[in-house]
Amino acid sequence: MVIFLYISDNTVRKLLKDAGAGRTSKEARNELKRYLDKKAFEIAQKAVKLSHHAKRKTVDISDIKLAIS
């Protein structure tokens, strides 16, 4: 099992608060954090592959948008 540590607990806490959650459990925050970390990493990997395929060293917005779609 790969553990990603890109998105901070404070970021997830703020996201949930802004979405209307008054209180959140640590388990709930950790689960959302794991999901968001994994999805962000997968998108980043796809974007890098797309930029390499286009023979570019720089990942640009079109790579990210295509990786998300």
Task: Annotate each predicted stretch with a short phrase.
Residues 1-69:
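Intrinsically disordered, low-complexity terminal regions
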